[in-house]
């Protein structure tokens, strides 16, 4: 689906199975449920991916978003969790050394566990949703604004657009991602997971999610960073000595920079906290950790060319996740 740049949109961050909270947010945004589908007379919702995994009502959340998309009331782009689900269920190509595009190891199993459990008695539904995931574009460029789950990188988006003008990939491209270092693998990693940098001196960091990593997520918009601490962009802080470590010239040159003069860009993915606000006048992250009892956040986009802090709308996720 092409987005009409003259229309008004509500961009919505990572849902992760928080269906009741999503309904609460849609209600707050002025959408009404008509004929079983949430609708707005003049606006359209744009979801930034990661509808599935982790939360208590994954199937319900998918039905809400899918029904809106089918009715022309919403567009949903692909998040890394939808990509993971396709990879989990898709055989790897011969010669790749893998059984599935996404290997069935304990770490990957843990991430998709809630989704598979909640669909255990609804296999036809799961099959249909997996097919729908292929209709989710990896990116959307509406001219005056752009959406991608984690990171806008023209170095990947330009060749992708040449092959997939609507941003929607096919199974062949998904299977190509089974090969580490391939264009497909790197494109998914960059657009759906963002940029990262290896920790120095062989260090590892165990995050709040319990996973141990040898790298950290980085900003892709800093103009003149000096230290690791200037570029870290994740919930888990770097140890102070690491944060103070100067960036080498090679590391600085490797950083991606989304320019301040580029179109408005909306991303999810990054588990932010606090009061929703722009990162820069042309950049907003709308993932505020809803599934960790944070906020489910939207931005109400009209015709502005710079982001307005007053146009963030959100619902605090209550314990347990309820609608009122």
Model regions: which residues?
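Divalent metal-coordination and catalytic microenvironments
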Residues: 14, 50, 79-80, 133, ...
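A short acidic-Thr-Gly-centered motif at the start of a beta-strand
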Residues: 1-5, 37-38, 63-70, 137-141, ...
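Active-site-proximal beta-strand elements of phosphoester/diester hydrolases
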Residues: 8-16, 145-151, 284-286
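N-terminal active-site segment of His-dependent metallophosphoesterases
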Residues: 1-64
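Active-site neighborhood of divalent metal-dependent phosphoester bond hydrolases
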Residues: 55-62, 67-197
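Residue-level marker for buried hydrophobic side chains located in beta-strands
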Residues: 11, 45-47, 76-77, 146, ...
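Acidic, His/Gly-rich catalytic cores of divalent-metal-dependent hydrolytic chemistry
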Residues: 166-324
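Active-site environment of divalent metal-dependent phosphoester hydrolases
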Residues: 18-19, 53-55, 82-86, 154-155, ...
């Amino acid at each position: 689906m092409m987005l009409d740049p003259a229309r008004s949109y509500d961009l919505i961050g990572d849902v992760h199975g928080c269906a009741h909270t999503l309904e609460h947010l849609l209600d707050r945004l002025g959408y009404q449920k008509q004929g079983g589908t949430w609708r707005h007379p003049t606006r359209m919702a744009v979801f930034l991916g990661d509808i599935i995994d982790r939360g208590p009502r994954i199937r319900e959340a998918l039905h809400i978003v899918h029904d809106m998309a089918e009715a022309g009331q919403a567009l949903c782009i692909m998040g890394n969790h939808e990509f993971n689900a396709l990879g989990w269920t898709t055989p790897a190509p011969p010669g790749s050394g893998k059984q599935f595009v996404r290997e069935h190891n304990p770490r990957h199993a843990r991430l998709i566990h809630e989704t598979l459990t909640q669909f255990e008695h609804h296999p036809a539904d799961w099959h249909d949703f997996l097919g729908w995931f292929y209709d989710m574009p990896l990116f959307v460029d509406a001219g005056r604004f752009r959406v991608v789950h984690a990171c806008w990188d023209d170095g990947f988006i330009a060749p992708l657009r040449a092959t997939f003008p609507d941003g929607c990939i096919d199974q062949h491209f998904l299977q190509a991602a089974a090969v580490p270092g391939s264009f497909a693998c790197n494109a998914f990693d960059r657009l759906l997971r963002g940029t990262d940098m290896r920790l120095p001196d062989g260090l590892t960091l165990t995050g709040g999610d319990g996973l141990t990593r040898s790298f950290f997520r980085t900003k892709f918009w800093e103009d003149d960073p000096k230290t690791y601490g200037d570029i870290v962009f994740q919930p888990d802080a770097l140890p102070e000595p690491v944060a103070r470590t100067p960036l080498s010239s090679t590391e600085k040159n490797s950083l991606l920079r989304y320019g301040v003069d580029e179109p408005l860009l909306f991303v999810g993915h990054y588990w932010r906290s606090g009061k929703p606000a722009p990162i820069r006048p042309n950049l907003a992250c709308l993932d505020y950790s809803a599934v960790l009892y944070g906020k489910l956040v939207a931005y109400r986009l009209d015709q502005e060319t710079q982001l307005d802090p007053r146009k963030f709308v959100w619902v605090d996720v209550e314990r347990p996740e309820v609608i009122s």
